Amino acid sequence: MAREKAQILDKDGIRRSLTRIAHEIIERNKGTGNLVLVGIRRRGVPLAERLAGRIKDIEGRTVPVGILDITLYRDDLTTLAHQPVVRSTEVPFSVSGKIVVLVDDVIYTGRTVRAALDAIMDLGRPKLIQLAVLIDRGHRELPIRADYVGKNVPTSSREEVSVRLQEIDGEERVVILETAE
């Protein structure tokens, strides 16, 4: 059983982090003309939708948002479950020639992002793929890094980062959980 060790971000901290990331995305890409956001199921989806809302507030332009299910692209599929739950990928636009910003809640080993890259490449040939995460907790196993980070949170192997979003969890905060070995 995991116990809560510390709260990293509250509702306002999450909001401020996403607002800053939205500004960084706009600035780095010189606007939103060729931009699409793709949220990685599960918590990357509401974060991508929120970023799109912030970008619209700032730029006055709507940025398309897609939903990516990476279940069948994971390299740990056999350890997940006998019958993994596969949900649909909903990317109702072409990614070819676009600047695709993948959005997820936490980056840890990099394996989820690797699977997402494979899934995106099966949809087309983007001009550029960038990564936005709310939390970077370190401990990468693959040479992958986020372009946009809400907060860097160094953790130990006994700790987990839990992002709780209103849309999914009914509360809004990020906490570190400590697990018993």
Curated annotation (Swiss-Prot):
Catalysis: reaction(s): UMP + diphosphate = 5-phospho-alpha-D-ribose 1-diphosphate + uracil
Enzyme Commission number, as recorded: 2.4.2.9
InterPro entries with a match to the protein in the record: PRibTrfase_dom, PRTase-like, PyrR, PyrR_bifunctional
Keywords: Glycosyltransferase, RNA-binding, Transcription, Transcription regulation, Transcription termination, Transferase
Intervals of motif PRPP-binding: 100-112
Record-annotated disulphide pairs: none
UniProt GO BP: DNA-templated transcription termination
Gene Ontology terms, MF aspect: RNA binding; uracil phosphoribosyltransferase activity
Subunit composition and interactions: Homodimer and homohexamer; in equilibrium.
Biological role: Regulates transcriptional attenuation of the pyrimidine nucleotide (pyr) operon by binding in a uridine-dependent manner to specific sites on pyr mRNA. This disrupts an antiterminator hairpin in the RNA and favors formation of a downstream transcription terminator, leading to a reduced expression of downstream genes.
NCBIfam families assigned to the protein according to its UniProt record, in alphabetical order: PRK05205.1-1 (NF003545), PRK05205.1-3 (NF003547), PRK05205.1-4 (NF003548), PRK05205.1-5 (NF003549)
Protein family membership: Belongs to the purine/pyrimidine phosphoribosyltransferase family. PyrR subfamily.
Name of protein: Bifunctional protein PyrR
Native species: Pelotomaculum thermopropionicum (strain DSM 13744 / JCM 10971 / SI)
